Amino acid sequence: MGRGSGTFERLLDKATSQLLLETDWESILQICDLIRQGDTQAKYAVNSIKKKVNDKNPHVALYALEVMESVVKNCGQTVHDEVANKQTMEELKELLKRQVEVNVRNKILYLIQAWAHAFRNEPKYKVVQDTYQIMKVEGHVFPEFKESDAMFAAERAPDWVDAEECHRCRVQFGVVTRKHHCRACGQIFCGKCSSKYSTIPKFGIEKEVRVCEPCYEQLNKKAEGKASSTTELPPEYLTSPLSQQSQLPPKRDETALQEEEELQLALALSQSEAEEKERMRQKTTYTAHPKAEPTPLASSAPPAGSLYSSPVNSSAPLAEDIDPELARYLNRNYWEKKQEEARKSPTPSAPVPLTEPAAQPGEGHTAPNSMAEAPLPETDSQPITPCSGPFSEYQNGESEESHEQFLKALQNAVSTFVNRMKSNHMRGRSITNDSAVLSLFQSINTMHPQLLELLNQLDERRLYYEGLQDKLAQIRDARGALSALREEHREKLRRAAEEAERQRQIQLAQKLEIMRQKKQEYLEVQRQLAIQRLQEQEKERQMRLEQQKQTVQMRAQMPAFPLPYAQLQAMPTAGGVLYQPSGPTSFPATFSPAGSVEGSPMHGVYMSQPAPATGPYPSMPGTTADPSMVSAYMYPTGAPGAQAAPQAQAGPTTSPAYSSYQPTPTPGYQSVASQAPQSLPAISQPPQTSNIGYMGSQPMSMGYQPYNMQNLMTALPGQDASLPAQQPYIPGQQPLYQQMAPSTGPPQQQPPVAQPAPTQGPPAQGSEAQLISFD
């Protein structure tokens, strides 16, 4: 909506009223003017007209179509964009289908045909041409078309141009200097270059809008040309014989010149009398009220009705004193002295050329000088304070209307005075006997000091405002300098901030570099510590290796024990069954090097004093034990009635089964079958995952080899027990777990172990000991 939406709605309702008998062209033209001058937006106007077109009343629809036709023809491109589109064309087609009124249908067809012809060269309005062709194909009969109906001559206001400087004076826009657009040309101007207001009839703008100086001159030039043609003389005067007469004034003879001189003398006489009266009045006023203001104009000027009155009695005494006064005014030295005194007086006076037009009565050339010089001496007696009175009154709230009234009264008095004198001159009357001329002269003479005061006030005001302009210019320069200083200060602050930021970045970079160096040093120290720890660990490992080597050398130098496993004994259970120890057993006063296995020759080297052998087998005297040979124990055989444990109670399936047999007697060993049960030394072996080959019951040679380092290293358990190559299997060897039957209590059996049957050698008979070897 626009600012004139209410007016537009009212005019649209009036133009489309169902009570109309004919088209209301006045309202339609006003609607067009509202749209053209921008008071109503084109989109809003077209939508409102569409609503009227779709009204059920055919009269309203017909008048709305008339309004739409006029708007399209007169309002330019903005309305064309709203009407010549697909939506509007579809709405008109739908209205044509459902409308039964013939006049409305014909009007719709007429408009579509006219718009299609008018917009035939506009590509963006091609939808109108397409709609027209489609409707022709559909069989609609269009009315007779005249090309004059499609003539659109609508000028619209140009689009506004945006810029940062004035189009005329090139002043940059800012906070104080604002942008203004000319409604006639669309350019952008400052306030000084676009201070004029004018109507633009060619754009339909009937109200005064802002225009630039060139457009204002162009528009007003046309208006003045039209006005001059209208203010010419009427044709009746031109055809009359009066116009054929010469308009030049008649030549004056000596008599006329003499009368004019007498008139000037009479004016001077009346002026002197008026000055004298004014002087006396001011003296009485100043003595009573020293600071009183001068009397207003109404008291000094006679009423308008008395200007043309001719009181004979008042003019008679003035005529009697003509001769002495006339002699005084003819004295040139007197007036020259008055002029010199007026020049020396401090009171400013009006310039002579300004007073000449008011006092000049006619075409005389000599008398105006004396008339202009007459009021000058009288200004000497006037004080300076009254001169500033009107100006102070004006500053205290006196409006300009009083000055306008004063000037109008003075102008009327002067014009009346001049006309009266001309009339007297034309009739040949003497002006000295005309009381109206004298009264007018007196009133004009009274107004003259006030006119001088007004001129002084205007001069003072001009000086005052010039001073203000100078101060404004100084303020403007100061603001410019201040703005420059502020900009320079901001630039300095920005540079300082940038420098501080750069220094901060440099410091941060230095700190980061120092921290990186410290980190590298810390990592280097950590690496050195780690290397040192590794070296210490390596030294400890070397020391342990040296200790192991020394231990091995000491073992190699020491004699071998006859029974290396003498301290490893297993206590028999109550049933007399011997169990193999399930794990290594620690004994006091022993030394076990790292990596040694319990049961090896290295294990238990530094044992305390060996306990005496409790077994029934004495050690071999005077011989050196072979490290590859392990002392054999003779296990007593069990009772004859003892049987092997059932297979259900067997241990791991990989272990050899128990087999009860009679060991064959071996030379050099005694049978202990008849001895009482006693604790036998248990044989501690390292855990093995494979079957261990035991020595069979065949006789073996008991020759011992010397105890050397090579045999000791071969006897160490450092090799993997799971390798079968290191566990040689001796053919004919019979593994033997002896079942022992104690003398007291029922016979018990050892846990049976799965054992393959012997492959070589017949089983031995009798209760004999068996030699068992452990590698």
Swiss-Prot record:
Principal location: cytoplasm
CDD domains: FYVE_Hrs, GAT_Hrs, VHS_Hrs
An example Gene Ontology CC term for this record: early endosome membrane
Pro residues bias (residue ranges): 744-761
InterPro entries: ENTH_VHS, HGS/VPS27, HRS_helical, UIM_dom, VHS_dom, Znf_FYVE, Znf_FYVE-rel, Znf_FYVE_PHD
Region (Interaction with SNAP25 and TRAK2) residue spans: 443-541
Binding residue positions for Zn(2+) 1: 166, 169, 190, 193
Keywords: Acetylation, Cytoplasm, Endosome, Membrane, Metal-binding, Phosphoprotein, Protein transport, Transport, Ubl conjugation, Zinc, Zinc-finger
Source organism, top-level taxon: Eukaryota
GO BP terms in the entry: protein transport
Topological relation to the membrane, as annotated: Peripheral membrane protein
Bias (Low complexity) ranges: 640-657
Record note on disruption phenotype: Mice show a defect in ventral folding morphogenesis, exhibiting two bilateral heart tubes and absence of foregut, and died around embryonic day 11. Significantly enlarged endosomes were also detected in cells of the endoderm.
Family matches, as PANTHER family: HEPATOCYTE GROWTH FACTOR-REGULATED TYROSINE KINASE SUBSTRATE
The record's note on its domains: Has a double-sided UIM that can bind 2 ubiquitin molecules, one on each side of the helix. The FYVE-type zinc finger domain mediates interactions with phosphatidylinositol 3-phosphate in membranes of early endosomes and penetrates bilayers. The FYVE domain insertion into PtdIns(3)P-enriched membranes is substantially increased in acidic conditions.
Protein name in UniProt: Hepatocyte growth factor-regulated tyrosine kinase substrate
